[in-house]
UniProtKB/Swiss-Prot annotation:
Belongs to the RuvA family. GO terms for molecular function: ATP binding; four-way junction DNA binding; four-way junction helicase activity. The gene is ruvA. GO terms for cellular component: cytoplasm; Holliday junction helicase complex; Holliday junction resolvase complex. This is Holliday junction branch migration complex subunit RuvA. Homotetramer. Forms an RuvA(8)-RuvB(12)-Holliday junction (HJ) complex. HJ DNA is sandwiched between 2 RuvA tetramers; dsDNA enters through RuvA and exits via RuvB. An RuvB hexamer assembles on each DNA strand where it exits the tetramer. Each RuvB hexamer is contacted by two RuvA subunits (via domain III) on 2 adjacent RuvB subunits; this complex drives branch migration. In the full resolvosome a probable DNA-RuvA(4)-RuvB(12)-RuvC(2) complex forms which resolves the HJ. One of its GO terms (biological process) is DNA recombination. Keywords: Cytoplasm, DNA damage, DNA recombination, DNA repair, DNA-binding. It is found in: Cytoplasm. Residues 142-190 are annotated as: Domain III.
Length: 190
């Protein structure tokens, strides 16, 4: 098993990158979150990896953090979730957001990810309950109810999870739901 790769980033063709390790180029599939975290071409990178061996291919998946790789490994254990769908989930949600959605049993957050329908989201929540949240302490970092309501409102209005989370962080502590939505929308429009 190839657990980690360090080398020079020589190509970015989403969702695949190529890392040169001593003259050998490794094609690695990465979630968009990892792709955005990568430095410019020619820079040195280290990725935590997962190797999938199939009859017709050996595919290397790369992640910026060990937590992301761990989440990927848990996701592909869920029936109906393959590697592509797992990458899609990690592209749409951070590991902490995924753990929080699992802990709070929020299927709505999962169904916003391409390739995840209502039944798949419910199965994912059921099969992953207690597996991911315990690893990163999602229950300790659970968002208060008003913030969850604000986040859900922003997501329903079509803003991405990343944009919505960024707007939430800018809100003053203890902001009510209606005031929070108003302030968040104001911040997002700028």
């Amino acid at each position: 098993m190839i657990g980690r790769i360090t080398g020079t980033l020589i190509e970015k063709l989403p969702p695949t990158i190529c890392v040169d390790v001593n003259g050998l180029g490794y094609d690695i599939e990465v979630p968009m979150s990892t792709l955005y975290a990568l430095p410019e071409l020619g820079a040195r990178v280290t990725l935590h990896t997962h190797l999938t061996v199939r009859e017709d291919a050996h595919i290397l998946y790369g992640f910026a953090t060990a937590a992301e790789r761990g989440a990927f490994r848990e996701l592909i254990k869920v029936s109906g979730i393959g590697a592509r769908t797992a990458l899609s989930v990690l592209s749409g949600l951070s590991v902490s957001d995924l753990a929080q959605a699992i802990t709070l049993q929020e299927s709505g957050r999962l169904t916003r990810v391409p390739g995840i329908g209502k039944k798949t989201a419910e199965r994912l929540l059921l099969e992953m309950r207690g597996k991911l949240g315990a690893d990163i302490g999602a229950t300790a970092h659970a968002v208060p109810d008003s913030q969850t309501d604000i986040l859900n409102a922003l997501l329903a209005l079509g803003y991405s999870d990343k944009e919505s989370q960024a707007a939430l962080k800018k809100l003053p502590e203890g902001t009510g739901v209606s005031e929070g939505i108003r302030l968040a929308l104001k911040a997002l429009v700028r």
